[in-house]
Design a protein with these regions (language model features):
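Metallo-beta-lactamase
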Residues: 1-9, 19-85, 132-149
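Metal-dependent catalytic neighborhoods of phosphoester/phosphodiester hydrolases
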Residues: 12-23, 163-164
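Short amphipathic alpha-helices and their capping/turn segments at secondary-structure boundaries
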Residues: 22-26, 95-102
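Cap/insert and terminal regions of metallo-dependent hydrolase folds
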Residues: 101-192
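Active-site-proximal beta-strand elements of phosphoester/diester hydrolases
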Residues: 81-87, 105-110
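Divalent metal-coordination and catalytic microenvironments
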Residues: 5, 33, 86, 96, ...
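Short active-site segment of divalent metal-dependent hydrolases/proteases
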Residues: 8, 12, 92, 113
Length: 192
């Protein structure tokens, strides 16, 4: 289980109520939960800007379970699955980069939550360091454009994924599509 960061909407499903007022338990009791150390330290220290985003019941049971693995630096967690660290949205946000068949998918998390957030200055008001977010987005978008990566969005209802193109206004979404359309199953009917 890879937790991009510890805001409630990104880690809240990692635990469930244990029942009869007995606290919480892991949703996936056999899984290792990966989070960045920078994000973990930031979340448990808490701060007035994000105090409503970090809920103890979402994160403390993970630590108490002994199933928490803290990531200190950008690395490959599994074969073909690496994480990058960003600090603009919240310190230690992990961006998964996944090699899948002949493609590279980048799960943008809250660095680029929707296709509408691709323009550099279109960011979330929730970002802790907005200018750093812009720099991190610029770097990721340029790399993704140069290497034909597929971006996968956390919060976009109409575009789960997209490819990129350079326009006269900068890097923008080229093709938008659903996650299932990345590599449809053999024998799938092609959409017209």
């Amino acid at each position: 289980m890879v937790l991009t960061h510890l805001h409630a909407d990104h880690c809240g499903g990692g635990v469930v109520k244990a029942g009869a007022g007995s606290g919480y338990r892991l949703t996936f009791p056999n899984a290792i939960y990966h989070a960045s150390r920078a994000q973990w330290d930031w979340a448990v220290k808490n701060n007035p800007r994000e105090e409503d985003a970090f809920l103890e019941e979402n994160i403390l049971p993970i630590m108490e379970s002994g199933h928490l693995s803290l990531v200190d630096e950008e690395c490959e967690l599994f074969d073909g699955f690496s994480v990058r660290l960003c600090y603009g949205h919240t310190p230690g946000l992990m961006i998964p980069v996944i090699k899948y068949k002949d493609k590279t998918l980048v799960y943008t998390g809250d660095l680029i939550p929707t296709a509408a957030h691709i323009p550099l200055i279109w960011n979330m008001s929730y970002d802790i360091e907005s200018l750093r977010t812009i720099d991190e987005k610029k770097s990721l978008l340029e790399e993704a454009l140069s290497n034909n990566y597929i971006l996968v969005f956390q919060h976009d209802e109409s575009a789960e994924c997209c490819t990129l193109e350079m326009t006269d206004k900068g890097i923008r979404a080229k093709e938008k599509f659903g996650f299932a359309d990345i590599n449809p199953p053999t024998g799938a009917v092609e959409k017209v």
